[in-house]
């Protein structure tokens, strides 16, 4: 039989007979590896263990203890779930099945009624029965005609057949007699599946379009070991407690009502106060660092986005243009860059003015599908803390360092400590997809690297991750829920200044092309607020808290006037304070203030009235201490002004 060469991750190459499977290769290495193996990768693509190999390739063995191993488990559990549902509710229709960051999901459409969360235990028990039976998850590729016949009567599966067709074939699984269309990679059988849990039911539009039917999406998770499932359930419990949507509702920060517009949050007074505090902080900080704040329209002529390239590259993320009837087409802006370019172009610029730093809390709109929307994290209307600096080429490195130092300063004030830097370069093996200027790329990438080294900052380098118009620095962070996201970005742009024909007059009296630096310190107000809600678990530091102090009179008729006097003194110092005059028991008022996570609870009674003092209780503490009212006010003012990051 013909031999083929198999390359392993360490670079070694071994010959095998043509037609060898991933499992065969694992067995040839060691019995223990074969027992741990659940899938493989061929030239980076995930494949089943029984995948035959007929040519020279590079492979990896995917084991149970890897991220890809979890994905294979989740794909398998999703298939088992379809079989379990079918056995309990014959005739049910199936939409998408897939995996997410922490588990799997299956979309269903039960014709006579919806599947509710109360029905999950019975479905889960059936899944466990199927898993214990150690059935095979039989995979095959069949013709489109066979696939359509297998899913006859299920309109969603029929559409998936047509969508997944490749060269006249469709990938399907037979799970205990139930045929399901899926390209996902699954286990050979259920024998390695040890722990499964169904978690919730939610609505999901078919294909993510609000004009399509609403299906029931069943979420679950599964693992190879029970202890891993228990750890995940504990993580999810913590995630729920930190979920900004849950906290946002409990603390009355914001709400989203699909009836008046999905992805369009309403900021309630508490949430608006937090946002306003962030915005004031950002503006003051940027002004101190030489930025000129502007206001620019949320509507712009479509031609500007054609010039910038947004229309060509990001049209699917933009709302449809508005035809004004006179040939003018207006567009809700998805980016602020063209607006700030117009500010720059409004005057003739001299080299003496550079760098010119323009900033704005700019409202933008993105065409997000309903299924992608989530609280404040994914919205259709957002306000970006955006900044654009126009520099001469020899100013790039110095300005890049200044922006980076500003970012680090902001992170410190918000107590953000868990972040990493990623320098993104163009792919040297595929330069065609980038702005065509080799000298520019080489020089600018070297400048950014030198700036990071000068500042003594650790970073990773990522080839192929640059924007098409220039290299960039991404600041990556882990949210309180363990998800990685980009907190801030600095991007060099050599293309837009050319597209919009930007100039400055140099010392030689000639026109020169500036370089544009895009930067966002803290992303959008919506996403950053969500990040902070989850990071602080709703217990904001005093300077950000919507209500910083609540004053509770022991007896309102005797101590209410003193409480009001204290309130007036604090309001004069810009402290956010309220007096609880309600006819409720003091213990109830204290518990409610703690539930609202107000940093300071002040109780005033006879002793406090007589001594002009307050009884102070910090959030999260059971004990109180007596303090002169003037001292308390002075201390909290200092705390607020210094962006104190602890409520103590």
Swiss-Prot record:
Assembly: Homodimer.
Any one GO cellular component localisation term in the record: cytoplasm
Gene Ontology MF term list: ATP binding; catalytic activity, acting on a protein; metal ion binding; threonine-tRNA ligase activity; transferase activity; tRNA binding
Subcellular location: Cytoplasm
Disulfide bond residue pairs: none
Reported cofactor(s): Zn(2+)
Annotated Zn(2+) binding sites: 337, 388, 518
Any coiled-coil regions, as ranges: none
Record-listed E.C. numbers: 6.1.1.3
Catalytic activity: tRNA(Thr) + L-threonine + ATP = L-threonyl-tRNA(Thr) + AMP + diphosphate + H(+)
Gene: thrS
First and last residue of the signal peptide: none
Primary enzyme class: ligase
Protein name: Threonine--tRNA ligase
Domain TGS: 1-63
Chief localisation class: cytoplasm
Gene Ontology BP term (one): threonyl-tRNA aminoacylation
Function according to Swiss-Prot or TrEMBL: Catalyzes the attachment of threonine to tRNA(Thr) in a two-step reaction: L-threonine is first activated by ATP to form Thr-AMP and then transferred to the acceptor end of tRNA(Thr). Also edits incorrectly charged L-seryl-tRNA(Thr).
CDD domains hit by this protein: TGS_ThrRS, ThrRS_anticodon, ThrRS_core
Cofactor binding annotation: Binds 1 zinc ion per subunit.
Region ranges (Catalytic): 243-541
Ranges that cross the membrane: none
């Amino acid at each position: 039989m013909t031999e083929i060469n198999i390359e392993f991750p360490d670079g070694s190459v071994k010959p095998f007979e043509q037609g060898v499977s991933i499992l065969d290769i694992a067995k040839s290495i060691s019995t223990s590896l074969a027992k741990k193996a659940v899938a493989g990768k061929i030239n980076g693509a995930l494949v089943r263990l029984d995948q035959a190999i007929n040519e020279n390739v590079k492979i990896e063995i995917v084991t149970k203890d890897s991220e890809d191993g979890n994905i294979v488990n989740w794909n398998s559990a999703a298939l088992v779930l379809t079989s379990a549902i079918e056995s309990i509710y014959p005739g049910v229709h199936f939409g998408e099945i897939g995996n997410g960051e922490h588990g799997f999901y299956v979309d269903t459409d039960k014709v006579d009624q919806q599947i509710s969360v109360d029905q999950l235990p019975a479905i889960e028990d059936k899944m466990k029965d199927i898993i214990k039976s150690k059935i095979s998850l039989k995979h095959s590729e069949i013709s489109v005609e066979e696939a359509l016949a297998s899913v006859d009567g299920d309109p969603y599966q029929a559409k998936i057949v047509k969508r997944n067709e490749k060269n006249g074939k469709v990938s399907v699984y037979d799970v205990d007699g139930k045929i399901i269309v899926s390209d996902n990679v699954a286990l050979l059988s259920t024998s390695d599946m040890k722990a499964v849990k169904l978690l919730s039911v939610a609505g999901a539009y078919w294909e993510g379009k609000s004009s399509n039917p609403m299906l029931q999406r069943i979420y679950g998770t599964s693992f190879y070991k029970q202890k891993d499932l228990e750890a995940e359930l504990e993580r999810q419990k913590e995630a729920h407690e930190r979920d900004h949507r849950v906290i946002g509702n409990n603390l009355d920060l914001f709400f989203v009502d699909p009836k008046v517009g999905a992805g369009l949050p309403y900021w309630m007074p508490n949430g608006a106060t937090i946002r306003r505090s962030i915005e004031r902080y950002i503006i003051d900080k940027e002004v101190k660092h030489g930025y000129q704040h502007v206001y620019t329209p949320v509507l712009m002529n479509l031609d500007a986005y054609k010039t910038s390239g947004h229309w060509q590259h990001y049209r699917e993320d933009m709302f449809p243009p508005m035809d004004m009837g006179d040939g003018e087409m207006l567009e809700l802006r998805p980016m602020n860059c063209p607006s700030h370019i117009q500010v720059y172009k409004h005057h003739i610029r001299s080299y003496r003015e550079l760098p010119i730093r323009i900033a704005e809390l700019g409202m933008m709109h993105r065409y997000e599908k309903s299924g992608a929307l989530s609280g404040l994290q994914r919205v259709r209307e957002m306000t970006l803390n955006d900044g654009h600096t126009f520099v001469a080429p020899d100013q790039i490195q110095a300005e890049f360092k200044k922006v980076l130092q500003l970012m680090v300063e902001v992170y410190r004030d918000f107590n953000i400590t868990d972040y990493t830097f990623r320098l993104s370069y163009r792919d040297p093996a595929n330069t065609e997809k980038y702005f065509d200027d080799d000298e520019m790329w080489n020089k600018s990438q070297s400048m950014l690297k030198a700036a990071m080294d000068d500042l003594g900052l650790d970073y990773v380098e990522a080839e192929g991750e640059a924007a098409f118009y220039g290299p960039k620095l991404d600041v990556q962070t882990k949210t309180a829920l363990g998800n990685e996201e980009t907190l801030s970005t600095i991007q060099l742009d050599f293309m837009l200044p050319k597209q919009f024909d930007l100039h400055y007059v140099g010392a030689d009296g000639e026109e020169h092309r500036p370089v544009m630096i895009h930067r966002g310190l803290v992303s959008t107000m919506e996403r950053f607020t969500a990040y902070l809600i989850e990071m602080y678990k709703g217990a904001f530091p005093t300077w950000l808290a919507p209500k910083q102090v609540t004053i509770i009179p022991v007896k309102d008729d005797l101590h209410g006037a003193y409480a009001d006097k204290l309130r007036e003194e604090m309001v004069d110092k810009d402290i956010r304070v309220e007096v609880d005059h309600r006819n409720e028991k003091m213990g109830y008022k204290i518990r409610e203030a703690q539930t609202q996570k107000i940093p300071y609870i002040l109780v005033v009674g006879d002793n406090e009235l007589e001594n002009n003092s307050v009884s102070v209780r910090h959030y999260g503490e059971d004990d109180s201490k007596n303090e002169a009212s003037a001292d308390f006010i002075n201390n909290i003012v200092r705390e607020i002004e210094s962006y104190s990051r602890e409520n103590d």
